[in-house]
Amino acid sequence: MFNMKKSLLLLFFLGTISLSLCEEERDADEDDGVEMTEEEVKRSLLDTFKNLAVNAAKSAGVSVLNALSCKISRTC
């Protein structure tokens, strides 16, 4: 359980850094100063949440598989 919490925290941290880098890049790309529409804001938020959920699910799956393989091979 502790390993899963650590990996989820790590993924959240990396996702936050990735998100901030993407926002900086997006700000650098905007040269005319046009604001984002509501649709673009919703799309970017949904993509961010989707990516975080997918990464969390992958991490949880890897943690479960590691725990199972450890118990099966009795190397814990």
From Swiss-Prot:
Prosegment location in residue numbers = 23-41
Judging by the UniProt lineage, the source's domain of life is Eukaryota
- In which tissues has expression of this protein been reported? Expressed by the skin glands.
Chief location category: secreted
Signal peptide span: 1-22
Q: Where in the cell is it found?
A: Secreted
- A single cellular component GO annotation: extracellular region
According to its UniProt entry, the protein's GO biological process terms are: defense response to Gram-negative bacterium; defense response to Gram-positive bacterium
Disulfide bond sites? 70-76
* Alphabetic keyword roster: Amphibian defense peptide, Antibiotic, Antimicrobial, Cleavage on pair of basic residues, Disulfide bond, Secreted, Signal
User: What's this protein's family per the entry?
Assistant: Belongs to the frog skin active peptide (FSAP) family. Brevinin subfamily.
Please explain the role this protein plays, according to its UniProt record.
Answer: Has antimicrobial activity against Gram-negative bacterium E.coli ATCC 8739 (MIC=50 ug), against Gram positive bacteria S.aureus ATCC 6538 (MIC=12.5 ug), methicillin-resistant S.aureus ATCC 43300 (MIC=100 ug) and B.subtilis ATCC 6633 (MIC=12.5 ug). Has no activity against fungus C.albicans ATCC 90028.
Query: What name does UniProt use for this protein?
Result: Brevinin-2ISa
